[in-house]
From Swiss-Prot:
<feature type="region of interest" description="Right arm (Gly-rich tandem repeats)">
    <location>
        <begin position="122"/>
        <end position="161"/>
    </location>
</feature>
<feature type="region of interest" description="3 X 5 AA tandem repeats of G-Y-G-G-L">
    <location>
        <begin position="30"/>
        <end position="44"/>
    </location>
</feature>
<dbReference type="InterPro" id="IPR002635">
    <property type="entry name" value="Chorion"/>
</dbReference>
<feature type="repeat" description="2">
    <location>
        <begin position="35"/>
        <end position="39"/>
    </location>
</feature>
<feature type="repeat" description="3">
    <location>
        <begin position="40"/>
        <end position="44"/>
    </location>
</feature>
<keyword id="KW-0732">Signal</keyword>
<keyword id="KW-0677">Repeat</keyword>
<comment type="similarity">
    <text>Belongs to the chorion protein family.</text>
</comment>
<feature type="region of interest" description="Central domain">
    <location>
        <begin position="53"/>
        <end position="121"/>
    </location>
</feature>
<protein>
    <recommendedName>
        <fullName>Chorion class B protein L12</fullName>
    </recommendedName>
</protein>
<comment type="function">
    <text>This protein is one of many from the eggshell of the silk moth.</text>
</comment>
<feature type="repeat" description="1">
    <location>
        <begin position="30"/>
        <end position="34"/>
    </location>
</feature>
<dbReference type="GO" id="GO:0007304">
    <property type="term" value="P:chorion-containing eggshell formation"/>
</dbReference>
<dbReference type="GO" id="GO:0042600">
    <property type="term" value="C:egg chorion"/>
</dbReference>
<dbReference type="Pfam" id="PF01723">
    <property type="entry name" value="Chorion_1"/>
</dbReference>
<feature type="signal peptide">
    <location>
        <begin position="1"/>
        <end position="21"/>
    </location>
</feature>
<dbReference type="GO" id="GO:0005213">
    <property type="term" value="F:structural constituent of egg chorion"/>
</dbReference>
Amino acid sequence: MAAKLILFVCATALVAQSVLSIGCGCGGRGYGGLGYGGLGYGGLGGGCGRGFSGGGLPVATASAAPTGLGIASENRYEGTVGVCGNLPFLGTADVAGEFPTAGIGEIDYGCGNGAVGITREGGFGYGAGYGDGYGLGFGGYGGGYGLGNGGYGGCGCGWGY
């Protein structure tokens, strides 16, 4: 029974690691100098930046509801009342209550002054690993990951790190 439990725990850990991990490119097959590392063509996983750098994977985001500035009072305001502040990108402004006929209520709301916004979105793009000829280039067999020095592999960057 204990052997079945240990086998089940190990299989679950293996499945979790293979589902939730990011491939490191070439996977230790000595492709580091051939230039395949930047594109992730090693066969074990895609490059880290290809899924979210403007490729074929659509991304949808939504902002949280704006919270913050609020004024609530049962008092009577006489004279000019001024409230200044900045609201979030998806800001709201609201005045509720009764205004006497002699007074006014006004909200000046503007956006787009250049202080808030998304100025640039850029991805990692496609790496172009440097291949030094037709053989094993620089770092074809480097200090691999998890194997110590002398191990073979790389991280997918084309230099065998």
